[in-house]
A protein has these predicted regions:
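Disulfide-braced loops of extracellular cysteine-rich modules
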Residues: 14-22, 34-43, 59-67, 79-88, ...
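Short, disulfide-bonded extracellular cysteine-rich repeat modules
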Residues: 1-7, 26-35, 43-52, 71-80, ...
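Divalent metal-coordination and catalytic microenvironments
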Residues: 176, 378, 486, 584
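Sequence context of c-type cytochrome heme-c attachment sites
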Residues: 140-282, 288-349, 353-367, 488-490, ...
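Repeat-solenoid scaffold signature
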Residues: 348-472
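A structural signal for short secondary-structure junctions
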Residues: 369-370, 462, 476-481, 573-579, ...
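Non-catalytic interaction/regulatory modules that flank or connect domains
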Residues: 448-516, 520-524
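Acidic, proline-/serine-/threonine-rich low-complexity intrinsically disordered repeat tracts
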Residues: 8-14, 52-59, 96-104
Length: 611
């Protein structure tokens, strides 16, 4: 109002209610607010910011012991173990307890035993059941013979086991004495010139492997199902000399025949174990001899070697599916069915059609072919597919230890398989693998040389004109014949060109060729020739080829080429691997003219087709 006066200043803003002693009123905002001015963790006491009084932590009373801790998470502190489960507290540390070793048997238990610790003292108990035997360190199921008291042994020798077998099986013993397996001879209805005879067979034949059994029985009869056949005094009517175990003992029992002992078991054989393991023959039993025929693994037949012991379907469709040899070959009265073309003995026929029938194919054209072509011809496209076989054996070079490593030389087959190509005991060999068979007409009839047969004079001097030791007889004109596959074994061996005899050498034992082969330092061709002369004299005398008072001289014998045909029956391949049309027809490598055809019936006219 025209007068100078002091302005009216509003009172400062204040906090309502008033702030505490340790607070200030912050008026910077729209509304005053009290804020603490004590630092974090401090409390206000009597207008001063001070640290709070913290009560002491809770503790366990009494204090916890070693390996414990005080747990204060609950209402009241409590001591708890600080060791993990299973640990113990020792000297203030958590440690694993010392566990005493479990009780054990001392001495330790043997194979097929378990240590029983449930009693006061550990004791070893047999783990095998009543129908099991310990063989090869394993409990193996066996037949009912396992528990027979009569087979508890001990047995002094093989005949002692056989004697016990005959107590229950006298008829079986009698039957076996009549078999070709036992006599190595039997009916030969298909053997040219010997159709009505029953005393010919393996022991009267000559071959181009180890030649003949005469004078070599002690070695050869390692594969005879008997004991003690050392010479012509062996009693084929004595059933106690039958070796039941070689055909019936479980292979895992360890039973085997020793080399050069006329069929005696190996010294390590457990005859009691073998006797208690007997059962139906398996391929191990049959293969113990047949896989090693001719002096070695797969040497002879070419379709029977040790690879078939654990055959796959690719190796052999029958054995690869678990079949045993006896499934096809066993007959009544211990007879074995079948006839090898190189043996000529039969005690019953065996043919694929026995199981598969005469028209096994869905394709009529194939069934039509089967009228004239054996099943094996197409279904065994090659033999010795898994392991090599001998295809040629030249005895004329034997006796030279200056060759190779003390008379042994190694080589390889076409696929790189290592084989022995020379052995001073036996000469030079040719091995082959995955061999395409040779083919011929066959109706079961064969021609086969015995040790007393003569060969056509003049043959054998050249490999192209060999002495034929064995061959099928049929040809294209024989209505019942079929084209069959064969392994043709070729070789060179000693002959008497004057008597035209294929000579039997004594190879094994005293007076034989093998033990007298000179050392490398003493080798001369003349010394080996003289050794052969002595060996041939001894063998020919035993075989009846010369008189007991006759002897050969070095110039009275010579070497000749030979061949022997053997039928191929095993190693049946899967169907997809069977021969097809063009494997034979329109194939220049297939020799139709050798089979009696004028030409290939598929591509020519008037060739001589039979179907």
């Amino acid at each position: 109002n025209g007068t100078c006066v002091a302005p009216v200043v509003p009172p400062p803003a204040t906090c309502e209610p008033a702030c505490d002693a340790c607070q200030t009123c912050d008026t910077r905002g729209e509304t005053p607010v009290c804020v603490d001015h004590c630092a974090p963790g401090l409390v206000c006491e009597r207008g001063t910011c001070v640290a709070p009084i913290v009560p002491p932590p809770a503790t366990c009373e009494p204090a916890c012991g070693d390996c414990q801790r005080c747990d204060t998470t609950g209402e009241s502190p409590v001591c708890v173990n600080n060791c993990a489960d299973g640990l113990l507290c020792e000297a203030g540390r958590c440690v694993a307890p010392v566990v005493p070793p479990p009780p054990t048997c001392d001495p330790a238990c043997g194979p097929c035993q378990v240590c029983d610790t449930t009693g006061a003292a550990p004791v070893c108990l047999d783990a095998c059941g009543d129908d099991e035997l310990c063989m090869g360190g394993l409990c193996r199921p066996v037949g009912m013979h396992a528990g027979f008291d009569a087979l508890a042994g001990p047995f002094a020798d093989g005949p002692a086991v056989t004697t016990q077998c005959l107590e229950c099986h006298p008829n079986e013993g009698h039957d076996f004495l009549q078999t070709a397996h036992w006599r190595w001879a039997g009916p030969t209805p298909n053997l040219e010139g010997h159709e009505g005879e029953t005393n010919l067979g393996k022991r009267t034949l000559i071959n181009n492997f180890c030649i003949a059994t005469d004078s070599n029985e002690t070695r050869c009869t390692q594969c005879h199902a008997g004991y003690g056949w050392r010479d012509d005094t062996f009693n084929f009517e004595d059933p106690t000399k039958i070796d039941c175990l070689v055909c019936h003992a479980d292979g895992a029992s360890g039973y085997a025949k020793a080399t050069g002992t006329a069929g005696a078991p190996v010294p390590a054989a457990d005859l009691t174990l073998a006797a208690r393991s007997v059962g139906r023959p398996t391929r191990d039993n049959c293969g113990a001899c047949h896989f090693y025929a001719g002096g070695g693994d797969n040497v002879k037949k070419g379709d029977l070697g040790s690879a078939l012991k654990n055959a796959t379907v690719e190796m052999d469709v029958h054995l690869g599916r678990g079949m045993e040899c006896a499934d096809c070959h066993a007959a009544d009265n211990h007879r074995v069915l079948g006839q090898g073309a190189h043996i000529g003995v039969t005690q019953g026929s065996l043919d694929c059609s026995n199981c598969h029938g005469g028209s096994p194919h869905a394709n009529g054209l194939l069934n039509n072919h089967a009228l004239d072509v054996a099943c094996q011809t197409c279904h065994v496209p090659a033999f010795s597919r898994q392991q090599p076989t001998k295809m040629n054996w030249d005895w004329s070079t034997a006796g030279n230890r200056t060759r190779g490593n003390n008379g042994v030389e190694q080589g390889t087959t076409a696929d790189g398989t290592t084989v022995t190509v020379y052995d001073a005991m036996k000469g030079d060999f040719v091995w082959e693998k995955n061999v395409r068979p040779e083919y011929a007409w066959y109706d079961g009839r064969v021609r086969r040389m015995m040790t007393d047969d003569t060969y056509p004079a003049g043959t054998g001097a050249d490999a192209g004109d060999p002495i034929v030791l064995g061959t099928p007889l049929a040809d294209h004109a024989d209505a019942d014949a079929k084209i069959w596959p064969f392994k043709v074994m070729r070789g060179r061996q000693a002959v008497d060109p004057v008597r035209t005899l294929v000579l039997v050498p004594k190879l094994f034992g005293p007076g034989g060729f093998w033990p007298a082969i000179p050392a490398a330092a003493a080798y001369t061709p003349e010394a080996v020739r003289a050794l052969w002369t002595s060996s041939l004299t001894a063998g020919a005398r035993t075989a009846g080829q010369i008189r007991a008072d006759e002897s050969y001289t070095d110039d009275a014998w010579t070497w000749a080429y030979t061949e022997m045909w053997m039928g191929i029956e095993h190693e049946v391949a899967p169907p997809a691997e069977a021969l097809g049309c063009q494997d034979c027809h329109a194939n220049p490598a297939f020799d139709f003219t050798a089979l009696g055809y004028a030409c290939d019936p598929l591509v020519g006219n008037n060739c001589g087709s039979r179907h």
